Amino acid sequence: SALQAEGRRFESVNAHTKQKSCEEIRETFFYFLPLLYKLSLSFCLITQEKELILQSDNYLRKRMELDVLTAISPIDGRYRGKTKALAAYFSEFALIKYRVQVEVEYFITLCELPLPQLKGIDSSVFETLRNIYRNFSEADAQRIKDIESVTNHDVKAVEYFLKEEFDKMGGMDDYKEFIHFGLTSQDINNTSVPLSIKEALDKVYYPLIEELIAQLKTYATEWAEIPMLAKTHGQPASPTRLGKEVMVFVYRLERQLAMLKACPITAKFGGATGNYNAHHVAYPEFDWKAFGNKFVAEKLGLEREEYTTQISNYDNLSAIFDAMKRINTVMIDMNRDFWQYISMEYFK
C-alpha cells in the first residue's frame, strides 16, 4: 500500500511537471513569435533586395560589352591604344591559336617520323593542316570555348576541335587519335607561351626599342657640340656636352638589349613527367629525346629544356623578364633626366 501511494504521488508530480513544461513552452513560443515574424519579414525583404541587385547586375553585364571604358584592366582599357599590338600574342584568342599551332605541327612531325600508323598520310595534306592555324578565326576560338564549357579543360578542347577539323577534311578518321599523342597539357602550354613571347619580342618589342635607340643616336649626333653645365647632387659641376649625355642612354640600352637577346627562349616538351614515358612504352624503337629537340627547334624555333618535371623550369623566362625590367629602368632614368633638363630650362 505504501508502494502504491508512492506511485500515485510520483504520477501526480510527473503530470504537474508536464503541464508546467507545456505552459513554459507555450509562453516561450508566444514571446518569440513577434521576433520570428520580424525576422522572416526581414529575410523576405533582403531576398527581394538581393534579387533586384542581381537583376541589375545582369542588366549591366548584358550592356557592358568590352571596350576601353568597361575593361577591368587599364592595359586593355585606358592604354589600349598603346598595347593593342600585343593582343595578337597575349590575348586568350592568341593563346588558343598558338596551342592549335603546336598541336598541328606536332602531328605533322609524327607523320614525318613516321609512326607506323601514320605512314598512310600523304604529305600533301600538311599545308591543309597548317591552314587550320594560319587561317584561325574568332569563330574557331569560340568553337573551342564552347567545347571547353563541356570538357572543363582548355587544352582538351583544342584537341577535340582539331578532331572536328580532321573530320571536315575527310580521309583522316584513322589518324585523328594521334592528335596530342603521349603529351600532357603543359607540353602544349609550355611551348605555346614561349612561342608567343618569342614572336612578340621579334615583331613588336625589339623593333620599338631599336627605333628608340636609333632616334637617340640621331639626337646625340645633332647635339654633339652643344655645351651643357652638368650637375652632381643638384649642384653645378664640370661642363659636358648634350650629345654625350644622350649617348649614355644609347650605350645602356644597347647593352641591355643585347643581354635580353642573349637569353634563350626555352620550352618544356617531354610528356607527363618530362621523361617521354608514354612515347617510349608505345614506340621504344624511336629516340624520343632527339625527336623532341628537333621538333621544338625546327618547328617552333625554341630550345627544349633538357631536364624538367611536368612543367617548365621557367628560369629562362624569368631571365627574359628581368632583362626587360632593366631596360625599363634605363628608360625611366632617361625620362627623369630629360624631365630635369626641361625643369632647368635646358629644353623649352
Predicted regions mapped to residue ranges:
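Serine residues within intrinsically disordered or low-complexity segments
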Residues: S1, S12, S21, S40-S42, ...
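Active-site-adjacent "gating/activation" loops or surface patches in catalytic cores
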Residues: K289-Q310, Y314
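Basic polycationic patches enriched in arginine
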Residues: R8-R9, R26, R61-R63
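A helix-coil-helix interface module used to build multimeric assemblies
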Residues: R63-Y276, Y283, D287-F295
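Positively charged N-terminal leader segments that act as targeting/secretion signals
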Residues: K18-F29, L35-L36, F43, E51
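Short, positively charged low-complexity motifs
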Residues: R9, K38, T47-L54
